[in-house]
Amino acid sequence: MAKRDYYEVLGVSKNATKDEIKKAYRKLSKQYHPDINKAPDAAEKFKEIKEAYEVLSDDEKRARYDRFGHADPNEAFGGGFQGGGFDFGGFSGFGGFEDIFETFFGGGSRRRASGPRKGADLEYMMTLTFEEAAFGKETEIEVPHEETCDTCHGSGAKPGTSPQSCPHCHGSGQVTSEQATPFGRIVNRRTCPVCGGTGRHIPEKCPTCGGTGHVKKRKKIHVKIPAGVDDGQQLRVAGKGEPGVNGGPPGDLYIIFRVQPHEFFKRDGDDIYCEVPLSFAQAALGDEIEVPTLHGDVKLKIPAGTQTGTRFRLKGKGVPNVRGYGQGDQHVIVRVVTPTKLTEKQKQLLREFDRLGGETMHDGSHGRFFEKVKKAFKGET
């Protein structure tokens, strides 16, 4: 099946900025992550989203993709011996030009399938409260992974037996064939289909691991989450992925954070936003109110005549920057609440206020009137 357009996969335009691409990736990767989405095609969609992001987030890869699409010669031909933008390893129809160079130069540039390889990376989705993301925490997580089988010590063979050289490839991990072409006879080398390139054959497999040399287990990992992580961000824990193959280094663990929304606060970067309601009297006459922050309640002076939508900044009351570059602020946005149920006395006072001309009133008698309004709205006599 033909690959979908990467821009279409992420749901962005071809002129999308890096930030727009990153935001789309975070949203979709969270939506289709197999740990959260149990749909049958979730894993495949997640893989497709990740592949699209890896290309479009890299300026060089994106430029090639915009020019060639999925037919990019550097991508399609597998990244082997490259010259002038072409990879000779991709011409399988001609019997493999890569093998010509291996024949002439002894295969020095070829990595054997049985050589050391880095272990696979693991992903773990972690849910944090709003406060945990802001202040960080230390915790232990359990991650499913593969470990060396204790029964066979990684050999894959039944105790008392041992792996033997593959009879098909004679331990080389590759099979050789010759092919006649218009250019002459070409030698082809391919991964051995019997041993999968390991060069080994296990006559009697380990009953515990079934010959793989590894068993699935859950391991506990101590993780220190830095203060200031945001929804969709990742934390790389080096060396905590799957074990390496044939002596290679282990993979890495990537922790993807999912931050729960807060009932009062909203976050944008390192800044926090909240709305506070004010009564008509508080907005008109001014007041001192207490505003909740992540660091505790603080007093905020509301000047007389404050309007709905007025924003106040509480410096340094936001979220710490995850890279240690200071602290965000908290923005308090005022919403003046219009009363819906008024007593007769309150209605009379408001009518009197309207007759007196609203904001054109400045003398002392009008100040006393405002005090009456304030008391009436507070239920005082």
Curated annotation (Swiss-Prot):
GO terms for cellular component: cytoplasm. CXXCXGXG motif repeats lie at residues 149-156, 166-173, 192-199, 206-213. InterPro entries: DnaJ, DnaJ_C, DnaJ_domain, DnaJ_domain_CS, HSP40/DnaJ_pept-bd, HSP_DnaJ_Cys-rich_dom, HSP_DnaJ_Cys-rich_dom_sf, J_dom_sf. GO terms for molecular function: ATP binding; heat shock protein binding; unfolded protein binding; zinc ion binding. Its cofactor is Zn(2+). Belongs to the DnaJ family. The J domain is necessary and sufficient to stimulate DnaK ATPase activity. Zinc center 1 plays an important role in the autonomous, DnaK-independent chaperone activity of DnaJ. Zinc center 2 is essential for interaction with DnaK and for DnaJ activity. HAMAP family: DnaJ. This is Chaperone protein DnaJ. The lineage of its organism: Bacteria, Bacillati, Bacillota, Bacilli, Bacillales. The gene is dnaJ.
